[in-house]
């Protein structure tokens, strides 16, 4: 059980340090509480809004924090459930008479479901060869590679189903007969349709197979990416920003394990940096897409979906980013990452 003090963060900590601590604790909230006195809270959502306002990772977290947090007194603990539900928050601090945090009540601990429901279609890219997962994919198509007791594609669908999605379409090609057989025989509370790709068309090209069939905005996902996010909030963000496409991106922090040398003129050294640290956003391979994109796909064009987005961006269309924390993204596109995903899911059980 996590200790209250483990969720405290200093107001002078950087936003990057705060993100790391959120990842380390596995929580979505931290508290600015000098000597235990509650001053502010900081959530992954607060940080997301901060970045979208132009904030940077090296700024102190007090620039992103919420200094009007909700709380309950020790005698008001019984009101926690209704407050968590009414305000759709993940946690509520309990304060004594001196304003010191004595406990934290989590929504999941009270079995409070604050997820926003979103009933829109989900399209899954499931036709690739999965060459990075060879030799597994010599026997099984990537969507059917097991992670624990379920294939990865089924795990992904279950995550979307938890938020109200029940209409799935898989764009299939490689070993498509195995994929169809599995999902047709699976006992499930959602529908799965298939679009047959006769030649490999890239992660974007297969969308042309859905012309005339997609009438509403939809989630578009790889078959090897598992996100621990609020899909309802993502969809609301997409609508409120008026995006044609919203790309879900994860914050990544990477330390180069070597000294980096910048080359100057005539073989001279212009600069040296020992094990530099890099911070960037990376594409998770999950998107919210307007149906217009499908109708405007060129028949037979072989293209990756990031290139489709870039084409719209250059044309002046509104394409956006929904940032999430690194720990919210699990990718099994490579063997090493597949094993990491398995271990992480085992720890969550």
List the predicted regions and their residue ranges.
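Bateman/CBS regulatory modules and CBS-like beta-alpha motifs in cytosolic regions of diverse proteins
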Residues: 1-21, 25, 31-34, 38-39, ...
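Catalytic-core segments of class I nucleotidyltransferases/pyrophosphorylases
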Residues: 218-219, 226, 232-239, 252-255, ...
């Amino acid at each position: 059980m996590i200790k209250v003090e483990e969720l405290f963060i200093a107001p002078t900590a950087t936003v990057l340090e705060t993100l790391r601590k959120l990842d380390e604790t596995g929580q979505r909230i931290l508290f600015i509480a000098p000597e235990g006195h509650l001053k502010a809270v900081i959530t992954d959502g607060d940080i997301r809004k901060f970045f979208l306002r132009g904030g940077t990772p090296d700024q102190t977290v007090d620039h992103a924090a919420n200094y009007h947090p909700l709380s309950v007194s020790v005698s008001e603990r019984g009101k926690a459930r209704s407050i968590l539900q009414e305000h759709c928050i993940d946690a509520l601090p309990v304060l004594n008479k001196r304003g010191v945090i004595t406990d934290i009540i989590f929504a999941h601990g009270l079995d409070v479901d604050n997820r926003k429901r979103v009933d829109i279609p989900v399209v899954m890219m499931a036709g690739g060869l999965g060459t990075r997962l060879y030799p597994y994919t010599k026997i099984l198509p990537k969507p059917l590679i097991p992670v624990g007791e379920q294939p990865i594609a089924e795990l992904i669908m279950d995550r979307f189903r938890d938020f109200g999605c029940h209409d799935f379409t898989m764009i299939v090609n490689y070993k498509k007969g195995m994929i169809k057989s599995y999902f047709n025989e699976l006992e499930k509370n959602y529908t799965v349709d298939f679009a047959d790709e006769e030649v490999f068309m890239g992660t974007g090209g297969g969308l042309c197979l859905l012309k005339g069939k997609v009438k509403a905005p939809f989630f578009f996902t790889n078959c090897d990416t598992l996100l621990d996010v609020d899909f309802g909030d993502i969809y609301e963000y997409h609508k409120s920003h008026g995006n044609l496409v919203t790309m879900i991106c994860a914050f990544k922090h990477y330390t180069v394990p070597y000294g980096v040398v910048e080359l100057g003129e005539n073989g001279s050294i212009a600069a040296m940096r020992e094990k530099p640290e890099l911070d960037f956003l990376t594409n998770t391979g999950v998107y919210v897409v307007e149906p217009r994109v499908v109708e405007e796909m060129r028949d037979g064009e072989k293209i990756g979906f990031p290139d489709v987005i870039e084409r719209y961006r250059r044309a002046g269309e509104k394409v956006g980013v929904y940032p999430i924390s690194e720990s919210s993204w699990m990718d099994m596109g490579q063997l090493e990452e597949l094993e990491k995903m398995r271990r992480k899911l085992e720890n969550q059980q």
